[in-house]
């Protein structure tokens, strides 16, 4: 059965895109069939995969997630097969649906849509889902209708948290949205785990991890992601950390193994 996982945190700069990309590739390396979905108008995941330039503009005229959402609510030219929106990245051997800056208008064109919180869920057809073991959604740093769509479409959520000062900013509101979706729209939605990122050897980082252990005793990942320059280098080369021999790549592989174990025992 396909598991759909949202990588979400209202706070920006916590490693959502890096986590989505590298967890996805790590799962792929275990033999899982993986689809990445870029649900952020900044399109950082699409840039990581070489689909957009540094300004978030597509390098060609191929359709993106914003086109697909407009089709789903009847505002665009209808394409009969959702799979036409899927791209394959050869370098990382992974499928993805890209984003672009036009997704920034999503709140406007979703405002009048029927069941606007379920548009993404309806886009992920049974035929599409049956092709994958995992679908990973890279969410934007916001609490708007796009995040609601991601959560309603998902089975679970992973929250990356930067192990630095102000790490808990926005977590309360995200937890509130999570509880709201779980109570009213997606009862089976689960918190797969909280992932400390950008961990270093400072006392501040150690304090944040201790606070996370207290706040999420059962959900905190055993693995942490350390701060390292390799993350930026990997993005610039459009190649997952998991394809190099480095500490961060091994950490993301360990996170993927934890996800698989948690899904088995859930």
Language model regions located:
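P-loop NTP-binding core
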Residues: 1-266
